[in-house]
Amino acid sequence: MTLPLPVDLSGRSLLRVGDLVPAEVEAILDLAGELKHDLTPRLAGRTLGLVFMQPSTRTRLSFSAAMAQLGGMPISLRSDELQLSRGESIGDTARVLSRYVDVAAIRTLSHDDLETWAEAATIPVINALTQAEHPCQALADALTIRDRLGGLDGVRIGWVGDGTNVLVSLAGLAALTGMRVVAACPSGYEPPPGTPVELVRDPREAADRADVLVTDIWTSLGTDEEAAQRLRDLEPYRVDGALLATAAPGAVVLHCLPAHPGEEITAEVLYGPRSAVWDEAENRLHVQKALLALLLG
């Protein structure tokens, strides 16, 4: 039997965490937990279009598996397989895509381009990562924290390193769910103004008594030319055993992956007993199943 949907998100897009209200976040996480075990083909006959302007491992695989587990069909396309690469506009591509599929997940560095996709499309559009935000990752992080710690309200998150799009989305979600984020970022690597974090410079301040310790890759999408300088600037912000020891007893470690062990995180921590990284990666699948089910009603 198909489970009733807890909120009505039918027909909506998800471009930023701020598109959601607290009750909707809770409903997505609750449904994601249920869909870990319920494989009812509720989206049989529906189609997901995946458009990736940048490489992807987890996002492409998890969205494809999510749609398949719900009984639907995923179709994945790279930018070089589309007429976009030969000058067709995003708007026209979105209008055509809307005639063939029921929902689209788009990965593109430019958030403005994502908004153009959503404005032209007549189907729900999901942000599968832009330089501005990564809302699906934030939802997976929240599900992982809730699974590990039993709840979200009052949880202290320590972020260490570059103030990336992942931090922006995680901080936005924390503000909706009663969590607090303390972010240690070097000068020049802060998140955008208005991001709801307590900003510090010393990584030990972020890690101190944190229930969750989070980091991200130092050389992310669009930053390869700056790699050498970034490695020098971020060297003091590595998550290692000594830093983890200052966190709360039972604290867990998150990383959205891919990871570079020895740079932003040591292998000891990444593969250690307090790492929830692999559960976090799996939970991308489950929160995206919930999103697809809710957006398609």
Describe each PLM feature range:
Residues 42-48, 153-155, 250:
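Phosphate-coordination loops involved in phosphoryl transfer and adenosine-cofactor binding
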Residues 35, 43-146, 261:
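Phosphate/diphosphate ligand-binding glycine-rich loop within oxidoreductases
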Residues 1-61, 65:
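Positively charged, low-complexity intrinsically disordered leader regions
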Residues 194-268:
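Rossmann-like adenosine-cofactor binding region
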